Regions:
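S-adenosyl-L-methionine
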Residues: 1-49
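Conserved class I S-adenosyl-L-methionine
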Residues: 51-60
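Glycine-rich SAM-binding Motif I of class I
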Residues: 62-66
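Short beta-strand element of Class I
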Residues: 74-79
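Conserved SAM/SAH-binding beta-strand->alpha-helix loop
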Residues: 82
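Conserved SAM-binding loop
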Residues: 89-90
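Conserved SAM-binding strand-loop segment of SAM-dependent methyltransferases
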Residues: 98-108
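Short loop/turn elements that flank and shape the SAM/SAH-binding pocket of Class I
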Residues: 110-112
Length: 112
């Protein structure tokens, strides 16, 4: 695990590091968070501002939502179908620095 990944999680007061293959199969992908270096490039390109609402399908534990809401001040909505992972995202939201700008929906992308 990259030190940068751990540092950002600590700063944002969330727990999103590590891969989880426990529920992956031919129809479902494993939980694997987007690297912070990728999110940093996205945040710095100027396309997302505080006037935007970010919609993150397959949000997992919410890393994309928390980071981009923190960096750009946008509002974020994460959509997750796996109840166990969704509960981790909600637990993160309770403590996250940007938690008030983030919400999660437990449903499939098709139904949202």
């Amino acid at each position: 695990m990259n030190q940068n990944e751990t540092q950002w999680d600590k700063l944002l007061k969330i727990k999103t590091t590590g891969r989880d293959d426990s529920r992956s199969d031919q129809y479902r992908y494993p939980y694997e968070p987007t690297q912070y270096c990728v999110l940093e490039r996205l945040a710095n390109n100027g396309l997302i501002t505080k006037k935007n609402v970010l919609l993150d399908y397959g949000t997992g534990k919410g890393r994309v939502c928390f980071y981009l809401s923190y960096q750009t001040r946008c509002r974020s909505i994460g959509v997750e179908y796996d109840e166990r992972i969704f509960e981790s995202a909600e637990a993160n939201r309770e403590h996250a620095v940007s938690g008030r700008k983030v919400s999660f929906e437990l449903t499939s992308a098709e139904k949202y």
